[in-house]
């Protein structure tokens, strides 16, 4: 089978397999070619190729095997090839658009992967850049030069006029933030990026520049204290900076619930509906709290449809993946997955250090590298606790008139946290945690099996034991089924190397550290 024969059939299979929006945005525009006997799928840039490979390569390979197209697996690279039309299916009819009214039959929607970038509808060609284009540029960290003011320099104004202008600007800004409920401190400039939030931050900036298009809704989830509120409010602040006339509102889901119930009690339901429909961007934090409240969920269902149909941007946060919100209306779960769903991960060591340094800079305090490393190693779970720890150390610095935070000051200010963190951690506790995390038996960790799915967790457990306990290498060996200390040393070195080379293992290790210590 030639590429010209295979690709139109593959397009048909993928069209039937994927949600309509995903196919239209990611698959339909692809071009293909053949280089040195290898079939190639071309993306518009490296970022697009990486996303195609991670999300769709397996599906394309499955179709290739199904059609017995005896070629090696596709490779993905930036470039331009040949565009083929999708193979027709005789008598095929496109499915009708589902009704959006309550009780209507739902359109099946595929669950969104954590790092997938789907679109709810095919985006019509337009002169302006799409959110996908902007996101690709952001991920490549393209520099943006500040715009220079044009025209001749204005005449210097008097101090009184300047003060009046400043006061008026401040009053206008305060009024704007009172209307939007946004915090002026939550901006992209004050956001620290790391592995755990880099993709979400890039997506958020793209949405701020082109709201209501490809990624609607933007659904951000993760544990408490990871910076979800900062990131979503930064979208609102950035949009207002670019479009001061935009109507933006941030709120917690509790406020939405109370607002709806008040409208029901006061018989002002129509006013309530119009109030929320006016916004260009609506941000609701902790949307999971509307679960189990049937009337509230019903009303939000209609509000969601309005935002979707009018291409107004909706941003939601939650502590879990949409599909895992127990008690949430299935129709809402489905619609939450129409846009872009991303997870925020706990900050890695480098990001925690960067957060501390940025906080110190904002507070006008100097922090020594050793002190920043100490605090970052002490507080691993989330950004909120890390900032709280810094605030305590910063307060001690001011009260003691010490402009530089050193490790001794940090230890003194955080001594109660240190005492709590230094609870007795044993090899048995670590072995149990690792076994549960990797879903293997404790007997396997302690046993003689050397298969990869057993040996690697065993080495991770040994390395964690070395880091979190005071046991010697021979004692660690005894705790792991009587192994020789050289075996323990080899395992620890192997894990140290893998943490530098394998991002997935490094993330697993960091999560286990947090689980065991908390």
UniProtKB/Swiss-Prot annotation:
<keyword id="KW-0238">DNA-binding</keyword>
<feature type="binding site">
    <location>
        <position position="225"/>
    </location>
    <ligand>
        <name>ATP</name>
    </ligand>
</feature>
<dbReference type="InterPro" id="IPR003593">
    <property type="entry name" value="AAA+_ATPase"/>
</dbReference>
<dbReference type="Pfam" id="PF00308">
    <property type="entry name" value="Bac_DnaA"/>
</dbReference>
<keyword id="KW-0547">Nucleotide-binding</keyword>
<dbReference type="GO" id="GO:0003688">
    <property type="term" value="F:DNA replication origin binding"/>
</dbReference>
<feature type="binding site">
    <location>
        <position position="228"/>
    </location>
    <ligand>
        <name>ATP</name>
    </ligand>
</feature>
<dbReference type="GO" id="GO:0008289">
    <property type="term" value="F:lipid binding"/>
</dbReference>
<keyword id="KW-0446">Lipid-binding</keyword>
<dbReference type="GO" id="GO:0016887">
    <property type="term" value="F:ATP hydrolysis activity"/>
</dbReference>
<dbReference type="InterPro" id="IPR013159">
    <property type="entry name" value="DnaA_C"/>
</dbReference>
<feature type="region of interest" description="Domain III, AAA+ region">
    <location>
        <begin position="181"/>
        <end position="397"/>
    </location>
</feature>
<dbReference type="Pfam" id="PF11638">
    <property type="entry name" value="DnaA_N"/>
</dbReference>
<feature type="region of interest" description="Domain IV, binds dsDNA">
    <location>
        <begin position="398"/>
        <end position="518"/>
    </location>
</feature>
<dbReference type="InterPro" id="IPR010921">
    <property type="entry name" value="Trp_repressor/repl_initiator"/>
</dbReference>
<keyword id="KW-0235">DNA replication</keyword>
<dbReference type="InterPro" id="IPR024633">
    <property type="entry name" value="DnaA_N_dom"/>
</dbReference>
<keyword id="KW-0963">Cytoplasm</keyword>
<feature type="region of interest" description="Domain I, interacts with DnaA modulators">
    <location>
        <begin position="1"/>
        <end position="73"/>
    </location>
</feature>
<dbReference type="GO" id="GO:0006275">
    <property type="term" value="P:regulation of DNA replication"/>
</dbReference>
<feature type="binding site">
    <location>
        <position position="227"/>
    </location>
    <ligand>
        <name>ATP</name>
    </ligand>
</feature>
<comment type="similarity">
    <text>Belongs to the DnaA family.</text>
</comment>
<protein>
    <recommendedName>
        <fullName>Chromosomal replication initiator protein DnaA</fullName>
    </recommendedName>
</protein>
<dbReference type="InterPro" id="IPR013317">
    <property type="entry name" value="DnaA_dom"/>
</dbReference>
<feature type="region of interest" description="Disordered">
    <location>
        <begin position="144"/>
        <end position="180"/>
    </location>
</feature>
<dbReference type="GO" id="GO:0005524">
    <property type="term" value="F:ATP binding"/>
</dbReference>
<dbReference type="GO" id="GO:0005737">
    <property type="term" value="C:cytoplasm"/>
</dbReference>
<dbReference type="InterPro" id="IPR038454">
    <property type="entry name" value="DnaA_N_sf"/>
</dbReference>
<keyword id="KW-0067">ATP-binding</keyword>
<dbReference type="InterPro" id="IPR018312">
    <property type="entry name" value="Chromosome_initiator_DnaA_CS"/>
</dbReference>
<comment type="function">
    <text>Plays an essential role in the initiation and regulation of chromosomal replication. ATP-DnaA binds to the origin of replication (oriC) to initiate formation of the DNA replication initiation complex once per cell cycle. Binds the DnaA box (a 9 base pair repeat at the origin) and separates the double-stranded (ds)DNA. Forms a right-handed helical filament on oriC DNA; dsDNA binds to the exterior of the filament while single-stranded (ss)DNA is stabiized in the filament's interior.</text>
</comment>
<dbReference type="InterPro" id="IPR020591">
    <property type="entry name" value="Chromosome_initiator_DnaA-like"/>
</dbReference>
<dbReference type="GO" id="GO:0005886">
    <property type="term" value="C:plasma membrane"/>
</dbReference>
<dbReference type="InterPro" id="IPR001957">
    <property type="entry name" value="Chromosome_initiator_DnaA"/>
</dbReference>
<dbReference type="InterPro" id="IPR027417">
    <property type="entry name" value="P-loop_NTPase"/>
</dbReference>
<feature type="region of interest" description="Domain II">
    <location>
        <begin position="73"/>
        <end position="180"/>
    </location>
</feature>
<dbReference type="Pfam" id="PF08299">
    <property type="entry name" value="Bac_DnaA_C"/>
</dbReference>
<comment type="subunit">
    <text>Oligomerizes as a right-handed, spiral filament on DNA at oriC.</text>
</comment>
<dbReference type="GO" id="GO:0006270">
    <property type="term" value="P:DNA replication initiation"/>
</dbReference>
<feature type="compositionally biased region" description="Basic and acidic residues">
    <location>
        <begin position="164"/>
        <end position="177"/>
    </location>
</feature>
<feature type="binding site">
    <location>
        <position position="229"/>
    </location>
    <ligand>
        <name>ATP</name>
    </ligand>
</feature>
């Amino acid at each position: 089978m030639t590429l010209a024969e295979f690709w139109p059939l593959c397009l048909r299979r993928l069209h039937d397999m994927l949600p309509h929006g995903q196919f239209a945005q990611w698959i339909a525009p692809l071009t293909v070619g053949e280089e040195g006997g290898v079939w190639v799928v071309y993306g518009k840039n490296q970022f697009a190729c990486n996303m195609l490979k991670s999300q769709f390569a397996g599906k394309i390979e499955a179709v290739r095997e199904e059609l017995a197209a005896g070629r090696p697996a596709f490779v993905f690279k930036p470039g331009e090839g040949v565009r083929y039309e999708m193979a027709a299916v005789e008598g095929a009819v496109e499915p009708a658009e589902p009704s959006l009214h309550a009780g209507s039959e739902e359109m099946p929607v595929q669950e969104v992967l954590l790092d997938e970038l789907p679109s709810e509808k095919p985006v019509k060609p337009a002169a302006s850049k799409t959110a996908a284009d902007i996101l690709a540029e952001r991920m490549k960290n393209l520099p943006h030069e500040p715009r220079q003011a044009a025209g001749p320099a204005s005449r210097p104004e008097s101090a009184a006029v300047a003060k009046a202008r400043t006061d008026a600007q401040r009053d206008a800004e305060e009024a704007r933030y009172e209307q939007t409920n946004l915090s002026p401190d939550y901006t992209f400039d004050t956001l620290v990026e790391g592995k755990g939030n880099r993709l979400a931050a890039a997506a958020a900036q793209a949405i701020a520049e082109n709201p209501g298009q490809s990624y609607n809704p933007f659904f951000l989830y993760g544990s408490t204290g990871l910076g979800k509120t900062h990131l979503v409010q930064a979208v609102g602040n950035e949009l207002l900076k670019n479009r001061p006339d935009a109507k933006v509102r941030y709120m917690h889901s509790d406020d939405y619930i109370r607002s709806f119930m008040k409208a029901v009690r006061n018989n002002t339901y129509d006013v309530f509906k119009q109030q929320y429909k006016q916004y260009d961007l609506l941000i609701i934090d902790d949307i999971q709290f509307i679960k189990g409240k049937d009337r509230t969920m019903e009303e939000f269902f209609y509000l969601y449809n309005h935002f979707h149909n009018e291409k107004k941007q909706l941003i939601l946060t939650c502590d879990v993946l949409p599909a895992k919100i127990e008690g949430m209306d299935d129709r809402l779960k489905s619609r939450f997955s129409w846009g872009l769903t991303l997870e925020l991960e706990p900050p890695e060591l480098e990001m925690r250090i960067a957060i501390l340094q940025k906080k110190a800079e904002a507070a006008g305090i100097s922090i020594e590298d050793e002190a920043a490393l100490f605090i970052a190693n002490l507080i691993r779970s989330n950004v909120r606790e890390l900032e709280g720890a810094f605030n305590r150390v910063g307060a001690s610095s001011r009260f003691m008139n010490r402009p530089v935070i050193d490790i001794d000051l940090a230890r003194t200010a955080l001594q109660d946290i240190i005492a709590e963190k230094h609870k007795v951690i044993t090899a048995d506790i670590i072995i149990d945690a690792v076994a549960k995390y990797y879903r293997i038996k404790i007997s396997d960790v302690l046993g003689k099996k050397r298969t990869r799915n057993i040996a690697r967790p065993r080495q991770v457990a040994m390395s964690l034991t070395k880091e979190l306990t005071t046991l010697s290498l021979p004692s660690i060996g005894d705790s792991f089924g009587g192994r020789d200390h050289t075996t323990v040393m080899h395992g620890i070195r192997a894990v140290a190397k893998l943490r530098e080379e394998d991002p997935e293992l490094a993330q697993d290790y960091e999560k286990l550290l947090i689980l065991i210590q908390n």
